[in-house]
Amino acid sequence: MSKEIRFSSDARQSMLKGVNTLADAVSVTLGPKGRNVVLEKSYGSPLITNDGVSIAKEIELEDHFENMGAKLVYEVANNTNDIAGDGTTTATILARDMIVNGMKQVEKGANPVLMREGIERASKAVAEVLLKNSHKVETSRDIASVATISSSNSHIGELIAQAMEKVGRDGIINVDESNSFDDELEVNEGMQYDKGYVSPYFVSDTDKMEVEMDNPLILVTNQKITNLQEILPLLEQVLKTNKPLLLIAEDYENEAISSLVLNKLRGAFNVVATKAPGFGDKQKEMLEDIAVLTGAKFYNKDLNMKLSDLTIEDLGTIKKVIVKKDNTTLIGHSSSEAVNARVEELKTQLANTKSDYEKKTLKERIGKLSNGVATIKVGATTEAELKEKKLRIEDALNATKAAVDEGIVVGGGAALVEAYEELKNQVRDTNVDIQKGINVVMNSLFAPLTQIAINAGYDEEEIVSIQKTAEKDFGFDAKTGDWVNMFETGIIDPTKVTRSALLNAASISALFLTTEAGVTELPKKEEPQQPVMPQGGMY
């Protein structure tokens, strides 16, 4: 396949068009008066959303160089989503601003390698200021405020705050569809462990890259499954029940994984394999907890129990299982009495142990078994509304968890402007090109506030000018048009979200500016069609 190669300004300018196209589509969603974007889906109804990463993911441009530029900015949004779970639109806006202004300097002859040094230095300095200015999330009201800002819906904010109150700040909260038109909060017994599927080929929902199973059978063992022959009698029994199967084992040989995946893809049976959490004695204890929760018999290798002896009676079951890349959530229980008895047993151990490590481990296990799993059930009148609402709640939930991790800063883009005012005379360098890189980051700190003002229909230059001289913690409420104390009004952002958005934007921008060549595949030339000869003979 032939390739097209473009160099220096030609390559960067082509990719910049893609950056602008993607950023234009994403930036309209920012702020309390941000709009939605409609995404065509290959099946089902269109998706209406204001989620930056969902929009960026769908953008594919015809021109290969423009598409490369768009995909680079998508990486900013995606990485921010992976780290913080929200802030993807802010990350995209920051990245575009840094790239556009950085390009202007490079085109004028600035050294992009030295500019990169300035970009990295300034972004780290801003990130440190954000952490310094961060406030701990202390009240349920703080949690509700973060969720409300992220979802633009006070009802959703209250629902998430209630969920965290019931299962704890480190508890498990899932989002599911409701059978009614109303939103509901449901709390079940259950737990989560930090191991996901052993192969992505087990995934049934490719959008979320996860597997959901209702009422699955569950095998719990600390043994290694080497091939399907040793559990074949069990699989044949499971097949007759027509129920899905979750395997939790210490490890799997590649042969066993390949056989399971092949049977899953062929539709022979619905199965997902995960590794057992923990190591050594801790692994055995956690598997015993899972066995109690699910009603399974723990097949312990230390007791010389053979996998070939397994029967369907040895398997447990549970209301629902959600398996993701890095974790598995078990929702429900087989017996409340058994779970309560297990919790009491662990509490007795906790009272008798003197080891700080053991105390910490036992508290974690008690918390996992006793706090349960909260499920926010989303109701809506149409499929399109349901999809959009679910995305909003998932974003708000991620933002809230990020706030619990690192605290909160003033929202509405004000935190970045405050960081600018604090650092504008501190982050300096005598090297002209390094200073230009610093300026690229510093000047980009106004971009989110600027876009919020534009989306709300206000004069962005006036808003930014007032924000620069505003009292600390005061900012612009784009919903009402008032200048308010952001913490008192509940206009706050998770520090982790804002910090991750900035650092990811700076990272990709620096790489973009140091790009000197681009290589893409040439579009295939369509073969000229042969003329069709008329049918029939002579008359």
Model feature map: region roles:
Residues E60, E66, I376-Y539:
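Extended, low-charge hydrophobic alpha-helical regions
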Residues M15, G31, G85, G109, ...:
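Residue-level signature of catalytic and energy-coupling elements of molecular machines
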